[in-house]
């Protein structure tokens, strides 16, 4: 588990998300409390439940990005789900327990990758020997010293990269599609479907076939196979289950859409309340059956988010409200924040587009007045049409750089400066025609 202090967590989040200090501080404390909990006596540790969070704010202000970056920072299994995708038990659709099953799948994949990295050196050594066997098959006529000498020469050529494009015949698993199990897509039967597929996989193991491929591709497959052999799959599952139960994060987006606020009909209120009641035991802490065994949700951190334009957290059922004790409102973004988003983050849009076009030999630079003009346009369009927050910058940048992106292969070595005049030239028609801005931006 990460030992970063709340201040260090906020500092790391600042590299990717502009503003929203209150939200950053709240999630940083929530993560630090997990570290603190692990240092308690076992008898008290189980009593300390995570303080789940509701983030309120319009779209495009950083709700999802804060949660996603937090999970990466802490190495925690993370999944983003949408509350509207689930239905209450008895109706066609996914049941809420499937989010825990999906989180467990992500946890297993995360641990498998970590363990594969740990044994990669051994896997590469074994894969290299198998690769040389493909290049130099065993022959009774070969002398021991002659064969070893040839093998060493091939090893040297391979390590120098001279054999990457040579083709070999290699036996690989045949990827066969299993029978469609649509019957198990019914509510409450997903777990049974997973168990049935596992049973079918054991009863009918995958067939192998010979395939011609380049040596570099064969090398990658052999490394994966050897790493898989070196891994203790039971250990991987045990570690993953522990990681999911103790550090897992489930981000539930659009929670406001299942709240019974103003303008909702009685029939939809009933359906929405059903989803909330199904969510309740998962958030409170229960045991969910997965293909990897039982997973407890008592200490999984739930971060919910929503715009809450037509409803408010108090419209949720009281029991669910009580399970989200922490609430924070994220600020809407204006031109100052848009300017900072274009310049400050480690993965700023301007850096992304400049790097993409640099692959074609085209150098793109942005002046300060050009960036401020983009920010002003984004704020203006958001005010006059739908406010989609920072996502507006994507559409603005695409329109501004559309011509150069199309012509880049024919203009290597060229330098393009995006200043205020360049921005106005490419966006002025949209500003003049307000109806056009609704469709283009």
UniProtKB/Swiss-Prot annotation:
GO terms for molecular function: ATP binding; ATP hydrolysis activity; peptidase activity; proteasome-activating activity. Its main location: cytoplasm. GO terms for cellular component: HslUV protease complex. The keyword Ribonucleoprotein does not apply. Transmembrane segments: none annotated. CDD domains: RecA-like_HslU. ATPase subunit of a proteasome-like degradation complex; this subunit has chaperone activity. The binding of ATP and its subsequent hydrolysis by HslU are essential for unfolding of protein substrates subsequently hydrolyzed by HslV. HslU recognizes the N-terminal part of its protein substrates and unfolds these before they are guided to HslV for hydrolysis. HAMAP family: HslU. This is ATP-dependent protease ATPase subunit HslU. It comes from Nitratidesulfovibrio vulgaris (strain DP4) (Desulfovibrio vulgaris).
